[in-house]
């Protein structure tokens, strides 16, 4: 046996690090990533499955936390001194960058989860020195423990920062639960270098679902597109990425101007003075990064973005001064000590009007970013900016509302908000649903309605298809969508191709007739919503399909959904929920950004499904004949609308040989190996459950002779889970 080698770093024995060798993904980079269906497992959560954050938060003295935060704002620490004696601007940036990763296309990113604590976000170039902000918060987090999550505390700190500098915020809702590991489901881009921008094509068309111009930035490059200091070109980037975060032009101007009413940027010297980011820093740094060798490494020697400006004469006080400075001077391009593009008033204008952050004897001229000047030189932004400049109260209200939206956009409906500062006003971006205002149906009513639905002439497949179409819009990322509200009958969902509008209209007409008859005759003001009836129709269909297979099951159903109206529904906002692909219905548009099977995994993750739940749902929905357009692809049974495990049995049958029948290899024929006769057709989504080793292992469970009962039970449980994903009203 060879002698053990000494480690040059530790002087100890060289050890093999578990998981450090070449991984399966290294060998097979196109392999499906099923790990995203098991992230945030209870096994990684130190608080245990019995922990209830809503209960813990209810014990929190929010006023006391806010007072501690206010005290912290002006308690400058030697290890990271506060600019202008106030940490408020730093905490605003921290909260902004926590929430600002949100994007509308898939609802991922945002403040919920406190992901800024983990890679890659904790080490993004745009988040330089926010590690210090979180360390400043640690004594407060330590004091209140699990009564307030990091995710909530970071946003609350931003709110208190604003309030402590004289701004009246719109409100605060708690309820963001921390995650305990990096989130692998979020696609941040394909670049392999920080600040790379391979995400563009054509005429600067930004890849979906991304909402930042470069890898490692929150929004835009403050120096201008690709570092080109062109304010008008910067406006195009700003408009695009802010729209992808659900912000219109007014909200965009309000956020930029409101955020830049405070604080300064930092570029005292070249970025070459900064050490590695937190995830690459030495163990002795204890999770901090960007150690600065320039001067003292802090205070006036701080390096963050590389830009060195202060926007206004009052950097720790709410005012309209950002607009006053923006419009009062003519601007000329200059460079920071770090070599970054920035703007100063022409000549010596403005000199001595802005305080120094650490030396009361020094004064400076104000400065602007290229992206700030976009608010003056883009004609649409300029008109809004001047209106805000001339109407300070209008600006303050717009910023308060936009900040609230920024920091709460990924939380879902208002029923999820916690605490005494939740605003009473319903906002359309919260996707409001009317409160229950009538007695709910009971078990006897449910049985009666099921019988009427089954006698209506609607097929099992159509009932199941419609219920799935309503519920499967849900996204666990930003808690939007779902069956509650019955928005499937409203624009835009009623016209989505995947929902088969003509068939959908017929189903809704029949269900509305059943609803009307019941509500007209039910005693005591009892009523059933269309949202409940749509879900109940799916339950009835599945129970009948199980009965067809010789099983008696009851699909769990809890009434209480309500019907939203068109005025409560922002059609443009809901448009992003339209699926490009839904493997559960064997639906896919042309020119997908990923292979259909990868789109299935993405959809399953947004539906908060595990790999076994996804697998059993696919098998069940295929035999229930719920394909888009009623195609037979993947319907591996001669008994459609009968809830059997036939899909798995026939998929894994070695008597079938599969061959592609399209150039794009998205459709396959399964032929009898002996006779050559066509048995089945299937899509990539169907065949992946026999091809992928992990999914095949799951499929085998349900294909076994003793897997029939388990298949029925697991399908019903997974179905009920999807139908109730948006029932936040049940956790009150």
Curated annotation (Swiss-Prot):
GO terms for cellular component: cytosol. It catalyses: H2O2 + AH2 = A + 2 H2O; 2 H2O2 = O2 + 2 H2O. Its EC number is 1.11.1.21. Its cofactor is heme b. The keyword Iron applies. Signal peptide: none annotated. There is a cross-link at residues 219-245 (Tryptophyl-tyrosyl-methioninium (Tyr-Met) (with W-96)). One of its GO terms (molecular function) is catalase activity. The active site is at 97 (proton acceptor). Binds 1 heme b (iron(II)-protoporphyrin IX) group per dimer. Heme b binds at residue 260. It comes from the Archaea. Bifunctional enzyme with both catalase and broad-spectrum peroxidase activity. This is Catalase-peroxidase. It comes from Methanospirillum hungatei JF-1 (strain ATCC 27890 / DSM 864 / NBRC 100397 / JF-1).
């Amino acid at each position: 046996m060879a002698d053990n080698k000494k480690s040059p770093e530790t002087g100890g024995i060289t050890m093999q690090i578990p998981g450090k060798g070449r991984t399966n993904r290294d060998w097979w980079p196109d392999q499906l990533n099923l790990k995203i269906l098991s992230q945030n497992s209870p096994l990684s959560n130190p608080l245990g499955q019995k922990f209830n954050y809503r209960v813990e938060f209810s014990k929190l003295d929010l006023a006391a936390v806010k007072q501690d935060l206010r005290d912290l704002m002006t308690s400058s620490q030697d290890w990271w001194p506060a600019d202008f004696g106030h940490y408020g601007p730093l905490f605003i940036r921290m909260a902004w960058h926590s929430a600002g990763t949100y994007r509308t296309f898939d609802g991922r990113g945002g403040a919920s989860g406190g992901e800024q604590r983990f890679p890659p976000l904790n080490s993004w170039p745009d988040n330089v020195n926010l590690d210090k902000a979180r360390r400043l918060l640690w004594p407060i987090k330590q004091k209140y423990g699990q009564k307030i999550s990091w995710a909530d505390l970071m946003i609350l700190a931003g709110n208190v920062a604003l309030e402590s500098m004289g701004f009246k915020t719109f409100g605060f809702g708690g309820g963001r639960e921390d995650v305990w590991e990096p989130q692998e489901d979020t696609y941040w881009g394909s670049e392999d270098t920080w600040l790379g921008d391979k995400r563009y094509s054509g005429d600067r068309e930004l890849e979906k679902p991304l909402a930042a111009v470069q890898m490692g930035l929150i929004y835009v490059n403050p120096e201008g597109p690709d570092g080109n200091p062109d304010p008008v070109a910067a406006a195009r980037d700003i408009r695009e990425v802010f729209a992808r975060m659900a912000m219109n032009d007014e909200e965009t101007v309000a956020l930029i101007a409101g955020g830049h009413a405070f604080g300064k940027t930092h570029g005292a010297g070249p970025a070459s003075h900064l050490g590695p980011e937190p995830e690459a820093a030495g163990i002795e740094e204890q999770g901090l990064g960007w150690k600065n060798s320039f001067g003292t490494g802090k205070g006036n020697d701080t390096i963050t973005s590389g830009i060195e400006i202060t926007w206004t004469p009052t950097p720790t006080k709410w005012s309209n001064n950002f607009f006053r400075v923006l419009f009062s001077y003519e601007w000329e391009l200059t460079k920071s000590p770090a070599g970054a593009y920035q703007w100063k008033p022409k000549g010596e204008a403005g000199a001595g009007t802005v305080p120094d952050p650490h030396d009361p004897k020094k004064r400076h001229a104000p400065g602007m970013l290229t992206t700030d000047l976009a608010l003056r030189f883009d004609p649409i932004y300029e008109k809004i900016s001047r209106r805000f400049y001339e109407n300070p109260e209008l600006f303050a209200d717009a910023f308060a509302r936009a900040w609230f939206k920024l920091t709460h956009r990924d939380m879902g409906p208002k029923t999820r908000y916690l605490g005494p500062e939740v605003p009473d006003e319903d906002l359309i971006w919260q996707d409001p649903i009317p409160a229950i205002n009538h007695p709910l149906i009971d078990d006897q009513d449910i049985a009666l309605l099921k019988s009427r639905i089954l006698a209506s002439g609607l097929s099992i497949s159509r009932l199941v298809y419609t219920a799935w179409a309503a519920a499967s819009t849900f996204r666990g990322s930003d808690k939007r969508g779902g069956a509650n509200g019955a928005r499937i009958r409203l624009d835009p969902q009623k016209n989505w191709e995947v929902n088969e509008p003509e068939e959908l209209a017929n189903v809704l007409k029949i269900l509305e007739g059943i609803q009307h008859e019941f509500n007209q005759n039910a005693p005591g003001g009892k009523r059933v919503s269309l949202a409940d009836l749509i879900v109940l129709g799916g339950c009835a269909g599945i129970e009948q399909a199980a009965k067809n297979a010789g099983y008696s099951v009851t699909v769990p159903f809890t009434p209480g959904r309500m019907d939203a109206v068109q005025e409560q529904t922002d059609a443009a906002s809901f448009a992003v929920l339209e699926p490009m692909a839904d493997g559960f219905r064997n639906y896919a548009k042309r020119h997908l950004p990923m292979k259909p099977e990868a789109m299935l995994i993405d959809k399953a993750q947004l539906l908060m499904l595990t790999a076994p739940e996804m697998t059993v749902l696919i098998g069940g929905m295929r035999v229930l004949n719920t394909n888009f357009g009623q195609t037979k692809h993947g319907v591996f049974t001669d008994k459609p609308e009968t809830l059997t495990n036939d899909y798995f049995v026939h998929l894994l049958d070695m008597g079938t040989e599969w061959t592609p029948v399209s150039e794009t290899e998205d459709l396959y024929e399964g032929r009898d190996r002996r006779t050559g006769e066509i048995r089945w057709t299937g899509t990539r989504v169907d065949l992946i459950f026999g091809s992928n080793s992990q999914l095949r292992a799951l499929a085998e469970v349900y294909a076994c002779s003793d897997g029939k009962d388990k298949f029925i039970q697991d399908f019903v449980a997974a179905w009920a889970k999807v139908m109730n994903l948006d029932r936040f009203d049940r956790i009150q």
